[in-house]
């Protein structure tokens, strides 16, 4: 049998701020797929949503704090140095050129995956990476027709399949439901409410100390 490829997980997002709803599913994917490395990629200007409330350098700092004690995770800041929107397909092209024939696994939540046909050059994503879709057990809605066609062609039935080819598969990975949203955290911070245990303590402390997201300065 062929030796497994080096397998790198990629989790992009605004991380505005990063919280356990980002981190726990990614950790479960890391374990299930046996990722060699997990890269978190903060977006400078996301093309599909409103501009983040906090600047890119500050959000990247929070991500670094969130994974500082995780030897399997690191922060990839390449999108922060681009002018204009951060398109995932361009990031994957850069990574593929740098890393060669490793297995790249783009991690997406189920709701984000449903919107994939609205992304720039979305079919090219599968040429450059696998897509790992995190979902709650037993909860899967109808897929848009274009997406259903890709799933039928590309679905992987075992995580191990992703370690033996560099790109092209779609894996649905059940993860523990974590009902935390950045919107809810920002709202609580603006009202001066506690967000303890919703995000890593190092992240919470920095946000409170700096007064980001409108947290009251006492």
UniProtKB/Swiss-Prot annotation:
Q: Which UniProt keywords apply?
A: ATP-binding, NAD, Nucleotide-binding, Nucleotidyltransferase, Pyridine nucleotide biosynthesis, Transferase
Report the leader peptide range.
none
Any one GO MF term held by the record is: ATP binding
Q: Does the keyword DNA-binding apply?
A: no
Reaction(s) catalysed by this chain's protein: nicotinate beta-D-ribonucleotide + ATP + H(+) = deamido-NAD(+) + diphosphate
Q: Which GO terms describe its biological process?
A: NAD biosynthetic process
EC number, as in UniProt: 2.7.7.18
Pfam families in the cross-refs = CTP_transf_like
Q: Which InterPro entries match?
A: Cyt_trans-like, NadD/NMNAT, Rossmann-like_a/b/a_fold
Named in its record, the pathway it takes part in is: Cofactor biosynthesis; NAD(+) biosynthesis; deamido-NAD(+) from nicotinate D-ribonucleotide: step 1/1
Q: Does the keyword Secreted apply?
A: no
Q: Please name every pair of cysteines joined by a disulfide bond in this record.
A: none
Free-text function comment from the UniProt entry: Catalyzes the reversible adenylation of nicotinate mononucleotide (NaMN) to nicotinic acid adenine dinucleotide (NaAD).
The entry's family comment says: Belongs to the NadD family.
Protein name per UniProt: Probable nicotinate-nucleotide adenylyltransferase
The record lists the organism as Halorhodospira halophila (strain DSM 244 / SL1) (Ectothiorhodospira halophila (strain DSM 244 / SL1))
